[in-house]
From Swiss-Prot:
Organism: Salmonella agona (strain SL483)
Annotated site residues (Increases basicity of active site His) in this chain: 84
Family: Belongs to the HpcH/HpaI aldolase family.
Subunit structure: Homohexamer; trimer of dimers.
Lineage of source species: Bacteria, Pseudomonadati, Pseudomonadota, Gammaproteobacteria, Enterobacterales
Protein name: 4-hydroxy-2-oxo-heptane-1,7-dioate aldolase
The protein's required cofactors: a divalent metal cation
Amino acid sequence: MKNAFKDALKAGRPQIGLWLGLANSYSAELLAGAGFDWLLIDGEHAPNNVQTVLTQLQAIAPYPSQPVVRPSWNDPVQIKQLLDVGAQTLLIPMVQNADEARNAVAATRYPPAGIRGVGSALARASRWNRIPDYLHQANDAMCVLVQIETREAMSNLASILDVDGIDGVFIGPADLSADMGFAGNPQHPEVQAAIENAIVQIRAAGKAPGILMANEALAKRYLELGALFVAVGVDTTLLARGAEVLAARFGAEKKLSGASGVY
């Protein structure tokens, strides 16, 4: 079994991604052909469930873009279900400390290395037990990315990086800026300093730093600092802003977004 996304991170090859929030397999397949290295299927803030994640994994599968799935929480039951339908790379939100990072890793591993329940006869991941020796290969194919999104998590970054099985650490600029007192302003100098320091620390520890940033100059800056998986846009934003621009060309009143920063 292989995980092309995990292999790319290990090799130090920067991976450029796009966030998927439309919760739709048709749009997921459309974007899978756009040329991004990875696509994030969002189960935290988008209206996804296990079934809609499954259909998007199926839609993306024929294309080179690699799927990354974000569950709504660091929940072993939800993680088990997502792995069974075929997710190999998970982005676990709001991890605050090393214990929570260890719990995330354990949820992705079969015993004795972890606590993932064995149900491979029912699982797309094992091709319903058609993959020889799946139970002994699956653990090594898992890629666990954890999100640090608060000052507490930042203060615990060194211990999080020491956890075996953590492949990458994703910095959540929207939540981090809010926690630091600068909600809606991830470009504040204090937030940017925290992000840049974290990227350097993560890379120095031999892990892959990641982030979502639609600002092109900042995204490129993070890549220069050593970020290895960077999402540079969101499908809902691309659709909404693109539609507004087109309508405005034909006289429609431009609807100004009140949001700023990351997306």
